Design a protein with these regions (language model features):
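Short, well-formed alpha-helical segments that are part of the catalytic scaffolds
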Residues: 10-24, 303-318
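A conserved acidic beta->alpha catalytic loop
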Residues: 35-44, 60, 91, 329-344
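Glycine-rich, basic loop-to-helix element that forms the pyrophosphate-binding segment
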Residues: 58-78, 360-375
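Acidic/His-rich active-site region of diverse nucleotide-sugar glycosyltransferases
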Residues: 66-70, 91-163, 167-171, 176, ...
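Short beta-strand-to-loop acidic/aromatic patch adjacent to the donor-nucleotide binding site
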Residues: 80-92, 380-391
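Donor nucleotide-sugar recognition loop
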Residues: 160-191, 195-198, 207-213, 454-467, ...
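Catalytic core of nucleotide-sugar-dependent glycosyltransferases
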Residues: 194-197, 206-237, 259-268, 532-548
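Non-catalytic, C-terminal membrane-associated alpha-helical segments of glycosyltransferases
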Residues: 212-217, 227-288, 574-584, 588
Length: 591
């Protein structure tokens, strides 16, 4: 079976030329469309005219690569597929040609990407395809360094060996990066000249904006090109665009400088991408087989920009269409906050299928979290919790769902956390700690009902009776959590997290934490109610899937504890606190 993958976005005018070739010929083929939130009725018309097509409707535009990844993962996970054919919405090809490409590829396992000859609507070789061709004539398989992804056949073995499109690219450049990786894996890219497909790409002039986006995509692909040395990656990905910007004149300079800055700021994400782990096929299969997903509870207040961003992050999650969403909106403290609160609520009402709970008065974050989590866990056996100032990896829900499922019966684990701000190369994924991080977390009904203790004074007294646990709660004196708990008792803060942390430590219950982080906290920009800090906790989030370890941990990871303790020692001193305060002021007034 070959999966024909099509990504549509407002492609109504193309659907007949796209799908009619399969109307009476589906032999060995399955046709699937991922629709990127079209507004012209594309998915409805496809279902009406071509009912044999499987349509996956997305609530937002994922971009070309991420949308194709949804179907590419299916081919990775299921042995019934021998490969996948990526078909642009503005392209057309016969079912017979797709089967011929698959047959040839099966006979030549050294091929990673195989394509037909791309023709335009007038029968000539399509201009973009012709750009990469050697001089004719072409006889048999013709190897190239790159072919655009309008008409790609990828054997399943290519997907298992090379992986998916990189989420670093939203639109443009993802096929160039994938071609680099295919060649790095020792596979060939090429086309068969006796097989043809049509690509109806219009030959209109390219706008300055698109030219800039293409240029940035090219430099990004070069910055992570595994075929290049580290110096060549740095030169082509960063120095070259910066130099071009400096040498340019007039109106071109500032857009090019902005492009160079964007590429520079992506370095932490590029580093994570280079360090991505091999495919966890069992984890992927678990994810695709999982039908019932736990609810997600999001807390918001008066920051429309933060709320809009996290809602967009959620829409990028592959699992979001099957995830129950509950949003808890706090009431305004004063008339000055009322407009911002209403703007936030208006954004939340637009989120597909979300249930919005609006507090009539301002209750504060701690009260809302305790009330919201407690109420939701009366009807659900687990919950994922987020706040509005978090930045999410597109695979945040993937890891959370996996860990909640695998560790449900391991009572020594009471908490999951994806905001690993103390990240380190020595830190393993799924490391267990007696530490309850609150930036992207989850728990189970039985753990919350058994362990949540609202009385901070009682928790402190129990800790003081056990000197070993008390010192552990201080992290060697580098993070004075007992002081924070005393302030909560005195009413100087209303932290729920410090009480949850203390309770888990007293009961020797573990938290399992992701690494790399899947959540970053951006609430230390001076916009929040409780926190400043100049971005000390900001981290890049994993641009690839992580999965839980099927063997549940039963004791704390001592290396992870020492890494966390050293992190507090390094960042929680007077010099660093002063530095972070200066950064916070700079961000607040000059960014």
């Amino acid at each position: 079976m070959i999966l024909v993958a099509i990504v549509t976005y407002n492609g109504l005018k193309w659907i007949d030329s796209l799908l009619q070739p399969f109307l009476y010929d589906l032999d060995q083929l399955e046709i699937a469309v991922v629709d990127n939130a079209s507004t012209d009725g594309t998915p409805d018309e496809i279902k009406k005219r071509y009912p044999f097509v499987r349509v996956l409707r997305r609530p937002s535009n994922l971009g070309f690569g991420a949308a194709n990844n949804l179907l590419m993962e299916e081919v990775q996970a299921k042995e019934c597929y021998e490969g996948i054919f990526l078909l642009n919405q503005d392209a057309s090809i016969s079912a017979e040609t797709i089967r011929a490409l698959a047959d040839y590829s099966q006979q030549h396992p050294e091929i990673g990407i195989l394509s037909p000859l791309h023709l335009s609507s007038d029968g000539a070789i399509e201009q973009g395809f012709a750009h990469y061709l050697p001089e004719s004539p072409y006889h048999g398989f013709t190897e190239l360094s790159f072919i655009n992804a309008a008409l790609w056949y990828l054997p399943r073995q290519t997907l298992l060996k090379v992986g998916l499109f990189s989420p670093l690219f939203h639109h443009y450049g993802e096929d160039l990066d994938y071609a680099h990786r295919v060649r790095f894996a020792g596979l060939k890219i090429g086309f068969l000249p006796h097989l043809t497909g049509q690509h109806f790409r219009p030959s209109t002039p390219i706008s300055d904006e698109k030219t800039l986006r293409l240029k940035q995509a090219y430099h990004l692909a070069e910055a992570i090109n595994p075929l290049l040395s580290p110096f060549a990656q740095f030169y082509r990905g960063h120095l070259a665009p910066f130099g071009e910007a400096l040498l340019s004149r007039g109106n071109r300079r500032w857009p090019l400088l902005k492009m160079a800055r964007n590429l520079w700021q992506m370095r932490p994400m590029m580093k994570l991408w280079r360090q991505r782990p091999p495919l966890d096929l069992e984890g992927l299969q678990r994810a695709l087989d999982r039908k019932e997903l736990p609810p997600l509870l999001l807390f918001v207040y008066n920051r429309p920009k933060h709320t809009e961003r996290i809602l967009q992050n959620l829409l990028q999650q592959p699992e979001i269409t099957n995830t129950p969403i509950y949003i808890w909106s706090d009431g305004a403290k004063s008339a000055d906050d009322q407009q911002a609160v209403e703007e936030v609520r208006a954004l939340c009402r637009q989120f597909p299928k979300a249930q919005l709970h609006c507090q009539p008065t301002n209750r504060g974050l701690a009260h809302n979290i305790v009330e919201g989590v407690t109420n939701l866990l009366q009807t659900h056996d687990r919950v994922i919790v987020l706040e509005d100032d978090l930045i999410l990896s597109p695979y945040f829900l993937r890891w959370m769902n996996d860990a909640l499922s695998l560790y449900a019966s391991e009572k020594r684990i009471a908490h999951l956390h994806a905001g690993t701000f103390y990240t380190s190369p020595k830190l393993r994924n799924n490391h267990p700690l007696y530490f309850a991080g609150s930036w992207g977390w989850a728990t189970w009904q039985d753990r919350w009902q058994e362990l949540w203790e609202p009385d901070g004074k009682q928790l402190l007294q129990q800790l003081e009776r056990d000197p070993k646990l008390y010192q552990r709660f201080r992290y060697g004196g580098f993070m004075d959590f007992p002081k924070m708990l005393r302030r909560q008792i005195a009413g100087e803060n209303n932290s729920w997290a410090i009480r949850w942390h203390a309770s888990l430590l007293l009961h020797q219950k573990l938290s399992v934490n992701s690494n790399p982080p899947l959540v970053s906290n951006d609430g230390f920009d001076g916009s929040g109610t409780h926190s400043g800090g100049g971005g000390r906790y900001h981290t890049a989030v994993a641009p690839y899937p992580l999965y839980a370890d099927p063997i549940a941990p039963t004791s704390e990871d001592p290396e992870a504890y020492h890494i966390l303790r050293r992190y507090y020692a390094r960042t929680n001193n007077k010099v660093m606190k002063g530095w972070y305060k200066l950064k916070e002021l700079w961000q607040r007034y000059f960014s």
